[in-house]
């Protein structure tokens, strides 16, 4: 449903942020 899509989108966003953070450090 729409909630699943939203959660998946949020998860991807967090994952990208974490990856950038790791690359930064």
Swiss-Prot record:
Minimum inhibitory concentrations (MIC) are the following: E.coli standard and drug-resistant strains (MIC=5.0 ug/ml), S.aureus standard strain (MIC=0.5 ug/ml), S.aureus drug-resistant strain (MIC=1.0 ug/ml), B.dysenteriae standard strain (MIC=2.5 ug/ml), B.dysenteriae drug-resistant strain (MIC=5.0 ug/ml) and C.albicans (MIC=7.5 ug/ml). This is Antimicrobial peptide scolopin-2. GO terms for cellular component: extracellular region. The keyword Secreted applies. GO terms for biological process: defense response to bacterium; defense response to fungus; killing of cells of another organism. It is found in: Secreted. Expressed by the venom gland. It comes from the Eukaryota. The keyword Secreted applies. Antimicrobial peptide against both Gram-positive, -negative and yeast. Also induces histamine release by mast cells and shows moderate hemolytic activities against both human and rabbit red cells.
């Amino acid at each position: 449903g729409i909630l699943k899509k939203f959660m998946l989108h949020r998860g991807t966003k967090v994952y990208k942020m974490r990856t950038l953070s790791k690359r930064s450090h």
